């Protein structure tokens, strides 16, 4: 294993999940890295919704998608991720990805916040189809502090284990509060009666 970056680790889950024709959501568009990946994986017959509250993010993402020759299967939306349910139907989405923090190279005073991120995750969970995947990459420290990280980790910890599989991974020996990836799978498990 070479110097594995958290983004590559998270994207490995996404690559295994998304199939041609899938509906996907990039809840925090940023510079469009995940939007581009989702667009390529979903292909011509798929559809990608990408959200951000900063016009700069939409402009950067549009440039990125054109430069990468991505299929025109996407819709870039200037709106908060907590409103994603207004743009997709329940239980139709294969993959939703979040990068929580602020836009790299952007205004650090504009960042995701725990209250809106929790509402967005709750909304997103209703959109996932059975077998769907949500990935959270939680950045903390620096300008954004630790409140969102702590609240989001507590929130996913309490998700119904009969419906969701939540995995928390982190660097054990990296300083400076490295990001924490958290994949959440909508499994809708049926546990044996003895385990209920």
Q: Where are each of the predicted segments found?
A:
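S-adenosyl-L-methionine
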Residues: 1-20, 62-88
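Conserved class I S-adenosyl-L-methionine
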Residues: 22-30
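Conserved SAM-binding loop of SAM-dependent methyltransferases across substrates and taxa
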Residues: 31-42
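Conserved SAM-binding motif I beta-strand of class I
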Residues: 47-52
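A short acidic, Gly/Pro-enriched loop at the edge of an enzyme's catalytic core
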Residues: 87-95
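Conserved beta-strand signature within the Rossmann-like core of class I S-adenosyl-L-methionine
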Residues: 131-138
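Conserved small/polar residues in nucleotide/adenosyl-binding loops
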Residues: 187-193
């Amino acid at each position: 294993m070479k110097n594995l970056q958290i983004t590559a680790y998270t994207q490995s889950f996404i690559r295994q999940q998304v199939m041609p024709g899938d509906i996907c959501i990039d809840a925090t568009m940023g510079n469009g890295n995940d939007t581009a990946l989702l667009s390529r994986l979903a292909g011509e017959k798929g559809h990608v919704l990408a959200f951000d509250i900063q016009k700069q993010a939409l402009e950067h993402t549009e440039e990125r998608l054109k430069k990468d020759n991505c299929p025109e299967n996407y819709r870039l939306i200037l709106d908060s991720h907590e409103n994603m349910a207004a743009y997709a139907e329940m239980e139709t989405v294969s993959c939703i990805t979040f990068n929580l923090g602020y836009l790299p190279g952007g205004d650090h005073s504009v960042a995701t916040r725990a209250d809106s991120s929790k509402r967005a995750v709750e909304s997103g969970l209703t959109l996932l189809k059975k077998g769907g995947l949500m990935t959270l990459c939680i950045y903390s420290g620096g300008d954004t502090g630790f409140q969102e990280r702590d609240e989001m980790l507590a929130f996913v910890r309490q998700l119904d284990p009969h419906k969701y599989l939540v995995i928390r991974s982190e660097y054990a020996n990296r300083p400076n509060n490295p990001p924490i990836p958290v994949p959440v799978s909508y499994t809708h498990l049926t546990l044996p009666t003895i385990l209920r």
